Regions:
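Short beta-strand/loop motif that positions the catalytic acidic residue
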Residues: 153-155
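Conserved acidic catalytic loop of the alpha/beta-hydrolase fold
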Residues: 1-15
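Gly/Ala-rich beta-loop-alpha elbow adjacent to hydrolase catalytic centers
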Residues: 20-25, 29
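Conserved alpha/beta-hydrolase "acid-adjacent" motif
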Residues: 160-170
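Catalytic active-site module of serine/aspartate enzymes centered on a nucleophile-bearing elbow/loop
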Residues: 182-230, 234, 240-243
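Short, proline-enriched alpha-helix->beta-strand connector loops that line the catalytic pocket
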Residues: 145-151, 181
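Active-site nucleophile elbow and catalytic-triad environment of alpha/beta-hydrolase enzymes
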Residues: 117, 121-143
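Alpha/beta-hydrolase-fold enzymes
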Residues: 29-116
């Protein structure tokens, strides 16, 4: 990420740089803010969460046991059951195995049909993800962030990754406690994990646009929304990103 940031700064000198991360990408952005403080003009954290230390400890112990038994590089259906399966139970009776992704049925269907989405991750990946979550959860690490970098948390109120808002609030409060002076949070009622692919995504793009403009030095205030993106139904396949 830092290499990409340097490339963008060289190619677009003087242009403000904001870093957006969704889901696992939000955890990577949080790692970036710790390791490279003060190198972006703002950060947007979407679909994030904040797991409790006890859960992380149990998860790492389970991963270590499974890796000793099966190895680190073999895909594991257990990981999918423990994560995606648990997420989906909230929305039973389920139409698909990924109803938790979105309240927009067309978006869910595009996800299911995409061969790059879903599947069983390896236990090694699960272990590394838990290690990363532990890293970004430690207060002594959060204190390394630049307190002047604006951060906004955006999530759906029905996103199980953020524990339906509870995990998002914990992450938000942790940033405030670490001294981040411009931390904001917004939960969208009824929306699930992929808020930028929900039917109401134009409102979210507008909120994000306004937040960014207000944090660009010298930018003229505006009440205008950005150009409307294509409707989710028409663009679901072209805007699909692997989870």
């Amino acid at each position: 990420l830092y290499t990409c940031r340097r490339h963008c700064a060289r190619r677009f000198p003087g242009v403000p740089l904001f870093l957006l991360g969704h889901s696992m990408g939000s955890f990577l952005v949080r790692t970036y803010l710790i390791r490279h403080p003060g190198t972006v003009d703002g950060a947007i954290l979407m679909g994030t969460g904040h797991m409790r230390p006890g859960f992380l400890a149990v998860g790492k112990a389970f991963a270590a046991h499974e890796i000793r038994r099966l190895g680190a590089e073999r895909p594991s259906s257990a990981v999918a059951r423990l994560s995606f399966g648990a997420y989906n139970r909230t929305f039973a009776p389920n139409r698909t195995a990924f109803d938790w992704i979105s309240a927009n049925a067309a978006n869910v269907d595009a996800y299911v049909a995409d061969p790059l989405c879903g599947g069983n991750p390896t236990m090694g990946l699960f272990r590394e993800m838990l290690r990363g979550l532990s890293f970004i959860s430690r207060f002594e690490h959060l204190k390394r962030m630049d307190p002047a970098t604006p951060v906004i948390f955006l999530s759906g109120s029905m996103d199980p990754v953020g524990e339906f808002g509870r995990g998002v609030r914990r992450a938000f409060r942790a940033f405030q406690k670490a001294g981040v002076r411009d931390a904001a949070m917004k939960l969208y009622p009824g929306l699930r994990h992929e808020i930028l692919n929900e039917a109401d995504r134009e409102r979210i793009f507008g909120d994000l646009f306004q937040w960014m403009v207000q944090r660009i030095p010298g930018a003229a205030p505006t009440s205008e929304a950005p150009p409307h993106p294509a409707s989710p139904a028409k663009s679901a396949a072209s805007t699909r990103y692997p989870q």
